[in-house]
Amino acid sequence: MLRRVLALICVAGAVCSAQDTEADRSALRTDLEPALSFEAAPSGDMPGGWTGGPAGTIFAETKIVHGGKGSVRIERNSSSGNEFSTVTKSIPIDFSGTTIEFRGFLRTEDVSGFAGLWAREDGEEPGLAFDNMQNRQLKGTTNWASYSIKLPLAAEARKLFFGILVVGTGKAWGDDLELLVDGKPVWELARTKTPETTVIDRDHQFDHGSGIVVTQLNSVQIENLATIGRVWGFLKYYHPKVTAGERHWDYDLFRILPSIVDAPDRASANASLVRWIDALGPIAACNPCAKLDSKDLTFGPDLEWIKDQQGIGSDLSRRLRSIYNNRASGLQFYVSMAPGIGNPIFKHELGYLQIKLPDAGFQLLALYRFWNIFEYWSPYRDIVGEDWNRVLKEYIPRVVLATTSGDYERELMAMIAKAHDGHANLWSALNARPPVGPCQIPVNVRFIENSPVVTAINSSTSDSAAPLKVGDVITALDGAPAVELIEKWKPYYATSNDAARMRDITHDMTRGACGDAKVGVRRDNAELALTVERVASPPHDLVAHDLNGSTFRLLSKDVAYLKLSSVKADDVPHYLHDADGTRGLVIDIRNYPSQFVVFALGSHLVNVETGFARFTGGDLSNPGAFHWISAESLPPETPHYPGKVVVLVDETSMSQAEYTAMAFRGAHAIVVGSTTSGADGNVSPFQLPGGLQTMISGIGVFYPDKTPTQRLGIKPDVEVRPTVAGIRAGRDEVLEEAVRQILGSNVSSEEIEKITKR
């Protein structure tokens, strides 16, 4: 994350500062010390002084402790919401120092993912510094042991969040925590900064629930809820009281919602909205007024609806148009732009991890928040391919009437999938995406020739998958035809195109209950019914389709091969040295690059300045408008690689991988393979109620001629797809074509197959 905006330094007089510091530090110690030792009285199941969730996974513990009388227990099973649970606390960073240390004792039992301490510093933007012990992989069953994480204290940091988390399933206990700055307990530090507070810090009316209950909806209510969803979003980004941060806009939604839900007709609901807007105060005439500059405009905000007097009434229409016409500046409380990049940074979008479902207010808030963020800040709104207004109305009853966390998460997934943005997934709740289950058949599956095909057997659990063979076409799972299951699951997979959707579905499709699974396969010309064991499967990333083994190798004296899944920018000179004298270089991006090497490598593939991308970005003064903002090019560097360059891509090539392929294509590389995932551009993350994590593509990425890449993906110059026969024979048909492009058609297929054999 980019780092900016210094916290305000306290400039009060010495006597005042000393008195404030003593009182504040005493209060901080009184609150924090018993919470860290878990000796504070619990609040229901939750340890005293802490928040966390999802509900039903965090417990105050008295039987298993490290010291004293209490500890915290995090307990997750296959039905727990989200992909992780966390107990959380926060304090203002009103002190100075060099290093924050968060340490304590942890104990685990059957943790499938990992457990750990975590801490995060936030400023104007989140994540200035972060650690969650993921790299230590604390999993399985362990006795009490001491752990520590350290963060450099950023000057911009305003708030510290910290706690304990568990990813996957299992149990973890925490106790006897300490929070230190440069070795001292935090409450012993002098107060050197005045913590900035916002209306969100002061308004706590709905911290424990919106109080809004909805058990059914009629057509009038749905229309009215769609209207307030759009009005609430418009005011969030255009009304000066909201953009200045004077209103807790989430909670203001809960204050108006009851009158909208209870309105007998559209006119009554519209009248309530008029009174709501009037209560915010008069709109001052703008001076100067913001203008929508048509220069370099790609598309403007979709605001025709505020002129629809028949639909929203003349009074409401007049007020909304007045607010729009008197917009004055680019000041935004809920969003800023990343300097030098231009993607939105979403601020003050709270995750409300503590809410208990069902809660119609918070569920509506989740829908409205995502819908409006996409409406006003997605550079690809114009190619969504859906009637985005209809999506809002369609999902109001589906999201609001969900009664369990799983149903709530799946309905949000289905709504988000309508955005057709591969970055816009419900990333923290993928365990709720069908098929659901804690176990999986230990094989890799890929969609080949319009069928799910086994492409690899997991060697560590090969006995469980013994009946299956590489090249088997899966035709059924537990008695249900695979083609029907895939169609049933498709709506929940948020991707930019079908290639990426089938990539994700085949990645998940063997999940389910642990134990035996019935699998129908087609092997050669035979239809087989097999019994295969599903086994516990920790969270894992998508499978790369590059070659196993070393990052760089010579396939022959004439062909060099470099895969980007393990590439290191510092090693580029070594790769180029070792490739010297070859006729061609294969760059395999059928993966996600381990490091950003667009310039470190790409600049050695050109001998003149070569443009390869153009970008679009949003407009803080005109939310919903997007402009061309910059272009990018490769500057030539020595040594120049003079040979032919072939880039390999497929459906696993996403985001940074696609951007890298664009750059190398600009350097006149030949792209071989199949369509990529079509999700490009720096991402802009934010939270949804329930502690759910999502994001959108934050900037538009285009070729120099303004041809889009989003949804379309990187189209190969030479299209080659793997075949079932090739998979069974252990061939890499995409790599074979790359070698053929380098060596020419005179080289026999047998020789090429020998060079590329996996």
Language model region names:
Residues 5-14:
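Bacterial N-terminal signal peptides
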Residues 19-198:
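Extracellular and organelle-lumenal recognition/adhesion modules and their flexible linkers in secreted
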Residues 198-207, 409-460, 464, 547-554:
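PDZ/PDZ-like peptide-tail recognition elements
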Residues 209, 227-347:
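Cationic-aromatic interfacial patches
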Residues 212, 220-221, 236, 245-248, ...:
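Cleft-lining beta-strand/loop regions that shape enzyme active-site pockets
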Residues 217-221, 225-234, 303-339, 355-376, ...:
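PDZ/PDZ-like domain segments forming the peptide/carboxylate-binding groove
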Residues 231, 235-239, 256-259, 370, ...:
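Conserved PDZ fold ligand-binding element
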Residues 241-275, 377-423:
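Amphipathic alpha-helical substructures
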